[in-house]
């Protein structure tokens, strides 16, 4: 069978998608050992894991770009799961970092706006996971700020306010939530080892995020098949009979 004939006779193979939407903690998640890379590894031949992390972004900017990332009529199925992972920049102190700071009330409104938009493009709440920012190690981040010639521009207590607001939005909307801020500080443990510079994740922090996020993702994708046949199951004489079906596993 000529290649053009094979292509014409086979049904299009649509890869389901998991969308990771967030700030630098998402952008960096595809680095070696990152939580996003670990998700992609777990979902090989089941889903494409798309990294849509934008370093330095807050929810004010995120809600503007979201319709450019997910829309109806794009020729792609809607994502089977979406993580929304903001707050680390929104919670920056207004006096020290006014550009990234977003007031708490606006942060809540922006999260709700993104959830509403996703619902409008056929991504229901049951596919969403809202992730709180991790706790801030003020001592380590203060050193980072000092090296950049600025004062400490975030406080862990303030980050906690944004984390609690994120959880409330998830509860109100019926979405899943991952409370990193609380989990990393559970029982008063030293959480500094989860962070590379007081704000961003260390290798141990990436492992922590993956271990807690995977169960939430898994229940949303557990019914998805392994795409295309196992190589031993491909018909030897006429492989097209095995390979030009409906993406059966």
Swiss-Prot record:
The keyword Membrane does not apply. Keywords: Hydrolase, Lipid degradation, Lipid metabolism. Its EC number is 3.1.-.-. The modification N6-succinyllysine is found at residue 63. GO terms for biological process: lipid catabolic process. GO terms for molecular function: hydrolase activity, acting on ester bonds. It comes from the Eukaryota. Probable lipase. This is Isoamyl acetate-hydrolyzing esterase 1 homolog. The gene is IAH1.
């Amino acid at each position: 069978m000529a290649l053009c004939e094979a292509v014409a006779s086979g049904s299009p193979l649509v890869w389901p998608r998991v969308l990771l939407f967030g700030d630098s903690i998402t952008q960096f998640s595809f680095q070696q050992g990152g939580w996003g890379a670990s998700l992609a590894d777990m979902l090989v031949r089941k889903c494409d894991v798309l990294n849509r992390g934008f370093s330095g972004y807050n929810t004010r900017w995120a809600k503007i770009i979201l319709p450019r990332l997910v829309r109806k009529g794009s020729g792609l199925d809607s994502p089977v799961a979406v993580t929304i992972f903001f707050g680390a920049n929104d919670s920056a102190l207004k006096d020290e970092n006014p550009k990234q700071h977003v007031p708490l009330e606006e942060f809540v409104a922006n999260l709700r706006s993104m959830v509403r938009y996703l619902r409008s493009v056929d991504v229901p709440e049951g596919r969403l996971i809202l992730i709180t920012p991790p706790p801030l190690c003020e001592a380590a981040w203060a050193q980072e700020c000092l090296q950049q010639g600025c004062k400490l521009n975030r406080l862990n207590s303030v980050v906690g306010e944004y984390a609690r607001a994120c959880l409330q939005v998830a509860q109100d909307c019926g979405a899943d939530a991952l409370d990193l801020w609380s989990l990393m500080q559970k029982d008063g443990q030293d959480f500094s080892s989860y962070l590379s510079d007081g704000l961003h994740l260390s290798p141990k922090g990436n492992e922590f995020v993956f271990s807690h996020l995977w169960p939430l993702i898994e229940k949303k994708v557990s019914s998805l098949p392994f795409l295309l046949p196992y190589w031993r199951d491909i018909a030897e004489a006429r492989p097209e009979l095995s390979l030009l079906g409906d993406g059966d596993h």
